[in-house]
């Protein structure tokens, strides 16, 4: 019996990192097609299957293709309905501010920008992609990710060895810098005592043992964390049963330096000890206090 074809559709906001994604999938051994027209994707997949030489392929579909916005959602539905392949949809995004900055740096025009500039084009594209984003198997916010970090995220989720495993992404962040766009669960730990106001701890972070001890030795933090971990421990099997391929848990404090980093590190360590594949990302830990 022929091996089932694995298909990944790479899509999302223009400027959010699809070029890096293409390189990442190529390095993983996927057969990659950039700028696939949705209306011909099904026929192309049929041709790939008939060749019998390819078992993993990735296709980039985005606003460069004529008719993309009208055709992509029906295309995804058609491919998902097939029993002879598995389909996963990767959606890349970033904040408006970050996308504007990237376009200014590259000096390229946004595909939906007219004479009114880059930002209105980004806003139009985001609205047009809402339905597609809701169907994604994995949404990755690349706002604070370097190309290397994005490649690592893709490798951890789409390498052949990890293709069918559930994956937990634990991240810390600072509320003052905005909510993470790709979080499934957001946990607010701003009620915990803040090491920022302790002179010896102010310029350390939740990656340092002294800060971790200050936060976790507090009875309130201990009680809270026990309840938090119990909640996550109960919820994860349910997410897996529902077919969710990943879960992003975002832990937030004021600046993303101390409390959120400490709790995120502790949660990630305990989940790893419980045999869950876990990636930890401290979004704002390197920002100045």
UniProtKB/Swiss-Prot annotation:
Protein family (similarity comment): Belongs to the RapZ-like family.
UniProt superkingdom: Bacteria
InterPro entries associated with the record: P-loop_NTPase, RapZ-like, RapZ-like_N, RapZ_C
Sorted UniProt keywords: ATP-binding, GTP-binding, Nucleotide-binding
Role of this protein: Displays ATPase and GTPase activities.
One Pfam family cited in the UniProt record for this chain: RapZ-like_N
Molecular function terms, GO-annotated: ATP binding; GTP binding
Organism the protein comes from: Limosilactobacillus fermentum (strain NBRC 3956 / LMG 18251) (Lactobacillus fermentum)
Binding site for GTP: 62-65
Source species taxonomy: Bacteria, Bacillati, Bacillota, Bacilli, Lactobacillales
GTP-binding keyword on record: yes
Protein name (record): Nucleotide-binding protein LAF_0356
Family annotation (HAMAP family): RapZ_like
């Amino acid at each position: 019996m022929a091996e089932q074809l694995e298909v990944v559709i790479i899509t999302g906001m223009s400027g959010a990192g699809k070029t890096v994604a293409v390189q990442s999938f190529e390095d993983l051994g996927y057969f990659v097609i950039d700028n696939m027209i949705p209306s011909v994707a099904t026929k192309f997949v049929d041709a790939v299957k008939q060749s019998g030489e390819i078992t993993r392929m990735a296709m980039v579909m985005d606003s460069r293709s004529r008719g993309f916005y009208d055709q992509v959602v029906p295309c995804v539905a058609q491919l998902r309905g097939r029993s002879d392949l598995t389909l996963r949809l990767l959606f890349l995004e970033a904040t408006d501010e970050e996308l504007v900055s990237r376009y200014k740096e590259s000096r390229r025009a946004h595909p939906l920008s007219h004479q009114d500039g880059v930002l209105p084009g980004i806003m139009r594209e985001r609205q047009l992609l809402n339905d597609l984003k809701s169907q994604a198997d994995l949404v990755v916010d690349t706002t604070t990710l370097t190309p290397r970090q994005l490649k690592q995220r893709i490798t951890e989720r789409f390498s052949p060895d990890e293709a069918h495993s559930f994956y937990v992404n634990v991240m810390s962040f600072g509320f003052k810098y905005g909510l993470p766009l790709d979080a499934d669960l957001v946990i607010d730990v701003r009620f915990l005592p803040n090491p920022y106001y302790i002179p010896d701890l102010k310029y350390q972070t939740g990656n340092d043992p002294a800060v971790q001890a200050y936060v976790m030795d507090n009875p309130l933090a201990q009680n809270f964390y026990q309840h938090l971990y119990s909640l996550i421990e109960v919820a994860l099997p349910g997410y897996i049963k529902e077919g969710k391929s990943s879960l992003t848990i975002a832990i937030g404090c004021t600046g993303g330096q101390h409390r959120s980093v400490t709790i995120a590190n502790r949660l990630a360590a305990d989940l790893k000890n419980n045999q869950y594949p876990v990636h930890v990302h401290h979004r704002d830990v390197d920002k100045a206090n």
